[in-house]
């Protein structure tokens, strides 16, 4: 690695020089790594009073416990022997090493190695967040502690949210791509990978010649985000042991080819009929059954039904006993009340 001058490792903030072309790439990287909506309520949409208070507390805690800025120092002969924490190679005299106070005085990195543990991007302006011995950019450090809504790119501070497709969404942000109606607590299909309500799904595939291939069906359900999730990213989603995989088969009775589940799920982890999976505290326990054959298996349902209900019923509604065609989805949904999975 060739020595780099201190100007290259400047810790100054990004600025737009009117005499030069703006550094849009650097600005975009800065906004990606340090989302303003994670830091200041002025950049957030539709925050309630409680959410605003939670955001302020969240920002203050991160600033106090994790935020830092690296310092670039020339490696002097007396400092020879320092090993880069990432590549494990020695820093040579005349090179610049980056030191992070929160990591300890003896730990240092090559400047290109001073990067986010999650995304691998070099930390712009050497701004870092320190968590469990690792460096993170602001975006991915925040996601260790709070779920991020894929629709609006804001962290979720409300107690209620919608869980679907292995992610958490603001309660009304998981919507049908056609009619924009919220799907929280209701069934949906995934034609082409985008959520679609049963009514729009039927309209789209009302033509008998249309293909169902690649269209899956699932059920979004409501849960709670919890207040403190400092144990790591694996707590931001439902435990994979409580979730079986996917749903609707392709037309013509062919077996399901595409299966969806949470990262890390496997056939060995799936619940068998009759098994009771223990859900993590503060998280909703829900299961989506894999449909192997349209003739043998009903639609998927949420597994958190009360044990006191009669067999064949779920939350007061009779479970479907036979394969439903697209034409019957709308009729069934128009008669059945909207079901929400709520936390006890």
From Swiss-Prot:
Q: Which residues form the PET domain?
A: 1-81
Record bears the keyword Zinc? yes
* Compositionally biased region (Basic and acidic residues): 272-296
Q: Which UniProt keywords apply?
A: LIM domain, Metal-binding, Repeat, Zinc
Skewed-composition ranges (Polar residues): 257-271, 322-344
In this chain the LIM zinc-binding domain maps to: 82-147, 148-207
Entry's Gene Ontology BP terms: actin cytoskeleton organization; heart development; muscle structure development
- What Gene3D superfamilies does the database record attribute to this sequence? Cysteine Rich Protein
In residue numbers, the region (Disordered) covers 253-344
Q: Name one GO molecular function term.
A: muscle alpha-actinin binding
Query: Which tissues carry this protein?
Result: Expressed in a broad range of normal tissues as well as in hepatocellular carcinoma, breast cancer and prostate cancer tissues.
Q: Name one GO cellular component term.
A: adherens junction
Superkingdom classification of source: Eukaryota
What is stated as this protein's family in its record?
Answer: Belongs to the prickle / espinas / testin family.
| Protein name stated in the entry | Prickle-like protein 4
Q: Which organism is it from?
A: Homo sapiens
Q: Which gene encodes it?
A: PRICKLE4
């Amino acid at each position: 690695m060739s020595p780099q001058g201190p100007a290259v490792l400047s810790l100054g903030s990004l600025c737009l020089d009117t005499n030069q072309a703006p550094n849009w790439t650097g600005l975009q990287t800065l906004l990606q790594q340090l989302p303003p909506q994670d830091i200041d309520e002025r950049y957030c949409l539709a925050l309630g009073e409680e959410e605003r208070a939670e955001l302020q507390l969240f920002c203050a805690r991160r600033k106090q416990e994790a935020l830092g800025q690296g310092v670039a120092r020339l490696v002097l002969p007396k400092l020879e022997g320092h090993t880069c924490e990432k590549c494990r190679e020695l820093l040579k005299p005349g090179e610049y090493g980056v030191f992070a106070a929160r990591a300890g005085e003896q730990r240092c990195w090559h400047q290109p190695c001073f990067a986010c543990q999650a995304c691998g991007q070099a930390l712009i302006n050497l701004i870092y967040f320190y968590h469990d011995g690792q460096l993170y950019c602001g975006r991915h450090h925040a996601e260790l502690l709070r779920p991020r809504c894929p629709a609006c790119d804001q962290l979720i501070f409300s107690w209620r949210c919608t869980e679907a497709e292995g992610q958490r969404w603001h309660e009304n942000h998981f919507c049908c791509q056609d009619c924009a109606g919220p799907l929280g607590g209701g069934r949906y299909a995934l034609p082409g990978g985008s959520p679609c309500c049963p009514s729009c799904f039927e309209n789209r595939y009302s033509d008998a010649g249309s293909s169902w291939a690649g269209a899956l069906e699932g059920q979004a359900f409501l849960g709670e985000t919890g207040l403190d999730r400092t144990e790591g990213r694996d707590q931001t989603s439902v435990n994979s042991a409580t979730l079986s995989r996917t749903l609707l088969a392709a037309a013509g009775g062919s077996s399901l080819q595409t299966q969806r589940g949470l990262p890390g799920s496997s056939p060995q982890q799936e619940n068998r009929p009759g098994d009771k999976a223990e859900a993590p505290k503060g998280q909703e326990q829900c299961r989506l059954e894999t449909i192997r054959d349209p003739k043998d298996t009903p639609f998927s349902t949420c597994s958190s039904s009360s044990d006191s209900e009669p067999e064949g019923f779920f939350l007061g509604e009779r479970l479907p006993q036979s394969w439903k065609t697209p034409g019957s989805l709308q009729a069934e949904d128009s008669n059945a009340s909207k079901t929400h999975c709520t936390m006890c």
